[in-house]
Structure formats: C-alpha cells, structure tokens
C-alpha cells in the first residue's frame, strides 16, 4: 500500500537506530552504500575494489537485507573497515538504501550495487566532478559490462514521453562520445551519486517502490526542482548485468509495471500527461502484449490493479511534488528523448522478437524484408 510518509521520497530522519557497527567520531566526506541480499559471492570483488581507492576520505556502509548465505559473517571477518548494517528482513533495494541513507554521514551519498567492481580512481573522479559542477545535484557513473569491459552497460539515462527510461550507451562500444562529461536526465541506482543537500530538499527513495524505478522517481523529482545530473566518464564501474536479479520473474514484472505507473503519475506535469496520453496508451498495449508472450500477463494486470487501489495516496504525493516543482512543462519536454514514440515501438518490437520462438523470429525477418 502507498504510504504518505514525511515527504514524497524516503524518510530523512537521522540517528543510529538499527544497530550499525563501527561508527567513528569524524564524519567522512563521502558515504558509499552497498545493498546485499545473499550476495556473498560478489562481496570480495566489490569491497576489495573500494579498499583500493586512491581517494580515502569515505565510509562504506553495507546494508544486509537479512541474508542467509553467511554474508554478514564474511564481512565482519574480512572487511573490518566496513560499517555493517544488519537488517532482520529483506526491505528490498529501496528500503535497504533508505536504511543506509539514514545512517550515512557524508556530503556525497553514493549508491553502489554489490555485483560491481569500481576502478581505483572511481571516487577521485567523482569528487573532481563534484567540484567542477557545483550546480549539479547528482552524478552518473560510466557502467561497463563486467565480462566485456569495453562495452557499455549504461552512462546514466534519458527519459521518454511514455515513461520509458533509456539507458544511455547500452550495449555499445566505449568510444570517444562516452569520454566527455555531459548532462543526463538521471543516474542508474546501481552506481548513483547524490549531494546530501539535494536529498534533504527533494527527499530520498520512495519506500513504496521496494525495487525498480525508485532511481527514476528520485531523479525525476530532482529535475523538477532544478537539480541537474552530470555524467562522469572517469567514474568507471564494471557491472554484472542483472547479477542480483533474475529477469522476467513474476515479482520483477509486478514491481516494474506498478512502479512505472507510480513515478509517471506522480511526477509528470498535467499538461504533458494529457499531451502524451495517446503514446502512453500505445506503450501500455505493447507492454501487455510483450508480457503475455513471456507468460507474465497475471503479474502485469495485478500491478495495474494495485495502482488503481492506491490511487488516492498516490495523487496526494503527486500534489506535493507538483506544488514544489520549479521546472516548467515546456522545459521538461525539451529535456526528453527525441522521437520517443518511435524509440518505444522499436524497443518493444526488438523485445517481441527476442521472446518469440526461433521459427517465428525467422518469419518476422522475412516479412520485414518484403515490406
């Protein structure tokens, strides 16, 4: 159920209420929050890379979401510098990060997936960018494929009119166009950097999301209040794509399709909701057909029903977001991806073809050649 909460994002309360370990008196300049749930096999690579950073003024907070694979014991025995926040249950990516944020002390708050390995100069590059772009409230890292390190996972994301977030550079070679800073709509939550002052103004993650699209929602709120996001090419992160999440399971489908509606209805200005309605309808029809092909029609429909059940609280959150918005609808429209409808339809068609049996994929290619 959607809760109103103290704001339209996650709680900003402070204090050591969750039994976190190893709290020093001096606050570090940066807090790195790593979420873990039964990911012990990733932790040596992730935490050792943090230990090797050239920039040293930071703390690592590992939030363990009630793991049963010995993750907590492994961290205590092998990484004594890590502040371990052991939760008694799985609060999801969203709830785990909110717990970490409530204990973080740095002026820069960095979220990092446990299935990553960061370059030794990762933090140094982030701090150089923070000094170079004081007007930016957030920063996106260059995420490369873990097993193919010259190919991009993402360099932040842009937003389309239908509510689709497009991972910038996904699957492309790491060429010259990805070696210069640029403004992007937002940072992927797998390696995202936020200024504390921005989070204290716009709120952190919305704890109703649990997982997926919480990063899009946060970046959307930040943009609406005038906080830009910069891509930092030197902040290199190697990422096991979906290393900690299975693709196309019912739970993932439910949260992704519910939360897509949550962030879209909560943040999109009314003028653009009306303007983009035909595109949004086409998007929903295409999404439903796609999930039917995957045998995921039930969780898809359950997600949409859940949105309707919680529409009242969601609209109250929307009122707060729109009341504090400083960005005009026209300015937001100019920030969005060009040719969004065409991009969405091509993306859906590519997914359809990938989900079809091989014989039908061959037929679709023949049909394309004839038309």
Residue ranges and their predicted role:
Residues 160-185, 200:
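Short, flexible, basic/aromatic active-site loop/helix in glycosyltransferases
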Residues 48-57:
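Short, acidic, metal-binding catalytic loop of nucleotide-sugar glycosyltransferases
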Residues 109:
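Short aromatic/hydrophobic "clamp" motif used to bind/position activated sugar donors
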Residues 28-31, 59, 217:
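Cell-envelope/extracellular polymer assembly enzymes that use nucleotide-activated donors
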Residues 185-236:
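A short, conserved alpha-helix in the catalytic core of glycosyltransferases
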């Amino acid at each position: 159920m959607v809760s109103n909460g103290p704001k339209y994002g996650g709680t900003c309360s402070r204090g050591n209420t969750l039994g976190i370990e190893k709290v020093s008196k001096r606050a570090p300049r940066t807090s790195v929050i790593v979420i873990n749930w039964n990911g012990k096999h990733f932790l040596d690579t992730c935490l050792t890379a943090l230990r090797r950073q050239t920039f040293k003024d930071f703390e690592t907070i590992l939030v363990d979401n009630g793991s049963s694979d010995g993750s907590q014991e492994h961290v205590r025995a092998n990484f004594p510098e890590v502040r371990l926040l052991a939760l008694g249950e799985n609060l999801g990516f969203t709830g785990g990060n909110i717990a970490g944020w409530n204990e973080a002390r740095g002026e820069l708050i960095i979220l990092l997936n446990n299935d990553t390995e960061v370059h030794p100069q990762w933090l140094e590059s982030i701090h150089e960018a923070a000094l170079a772009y004081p007007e930016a409230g957030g920063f996106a890292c260059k995420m490369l494929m873990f097993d193919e390190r010259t190919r991009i996972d993402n360099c932040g994301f842009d937003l389309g009119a239908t509510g689709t977030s497009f991972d910038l550079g996904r699957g492309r070679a790491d060429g010259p166009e990805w070696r210069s800073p640029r403004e992007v709509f937002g940072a992927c939550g797998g390696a995202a950097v936020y200024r504390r002052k921005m989070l204290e103004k716009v709120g952190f993650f919305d704890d109703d999301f649990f997982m997926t699209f919480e990063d899009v929602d946060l970046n959307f709120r930040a943009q609406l209040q005038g906080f830009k996001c910069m891509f930092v090419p030197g902040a290199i992160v190697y990422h096991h794509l979906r290393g900690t999440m299975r693709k196309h399971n019912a739970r993932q489908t439910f949260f992704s399709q519910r939360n897509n509606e949550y962030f879209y209805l909560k943040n999109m200005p009314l003028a653009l909701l009306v303007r983009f309605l035909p595109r949004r309808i086409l998007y929903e029809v295409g999404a439903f057909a796609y999930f039917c092909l995957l045998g995921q029609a039930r969780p898809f429909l359950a997600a949409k029903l859940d949105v309707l059940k919680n529409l009242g609280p969601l609209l109250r959150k929307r009122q707060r977001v729109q009341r504090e918005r400083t960005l005009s609808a026209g300015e937001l429209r100019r920030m969005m991806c060009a040719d969004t409808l065409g991009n969405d339809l091509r993306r859906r068609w590519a997914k359809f073809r990938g989900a079809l049996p091989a014989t039908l994929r061959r037929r679709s290619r023949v049909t394309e050649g004839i038309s």
